[in-house]
């Protein structure tokens, strides 16, 4: 009986240790306080849990975004999060602007590895940068695809933007110097009212972000910044190298997102969350399933 009891105790210890080891397989994913970041963080977590035995803890909507996530990554409190090349280069590494998107990605990846031992994984595909947009039908009727096209016809149109866009050198003054814009009129419009203004025909062109969810609702065309005036804000997973060393399978799993998300797809997903109030978790799941990734 004593021998049997000892065997049971030994087996209990083995199972308990196995349970502890399994519980230790965990990563922490952070997101910024915006729909896009919530959605991508969910995609990352769902892929990890679907293709490995690693558990995921989410720290969502971290106030201050990069300014608070970066130190938490350095402290090992967060393992990974979705970030933008322009933000990493200009805000974290504090370097001078690089206009070429491919060069920017290569340099920001090198800078993060050298400075923080963080790895930038492959790009998701979309670029959430500053943009100029106009009604799709109007753009097509006038053959406007690029900023240069718009500049050539700008005397016919009215631009709507928030006040500080007209004051910043990396805003309207810089665009005028680069492209030669000469709009018929420029209007100061509150940042939250720009889409309503263009929808009502009060303005013809607005500044915005290229993956804004409302672009879909108002059927606006994001014009191509053909001289690359605005920096690229291409998105990718940033992960601690220590985490990859511990769970090397994560790189292949997370890179399933590489090149999978277009600007238009990200716009639509943002719209579902911001306008239709769908849960980011559900939006992420439906997208991954549509791509055959789950």
Language model features with spans:
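Short, well-ordered beta-strand elements
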Residues: 23-37, 54-61, 155-161
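A conserved helix-loop-strand patch within extracytoplasmic ligand-binding domains
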Residues: 104-158, 259-263
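C-terminal motif of bacterial Sec signal peptides marking the signal peptidase cleavage site
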Residues: 16-19
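A bilobed periplasmic-binding-protein/Venus flytrap-type ligand-binding module shared by bacterial periplasmic
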Residues: 129-140, 234-247
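A local structural motif
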Residues: 50-61, 155-158, 176-189
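Short helices/loops that flank or line small-molecule/ion binding pockets
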Residues: 47, 67-78, 173-178, 191-206
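Ligand-binding "clamshell"
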Residues: 92-121, 202, 214-228
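Short helix-initiation/N-cap motifs at beta->coil->alpha
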Residues: 35, 57-71, 163, 184-196
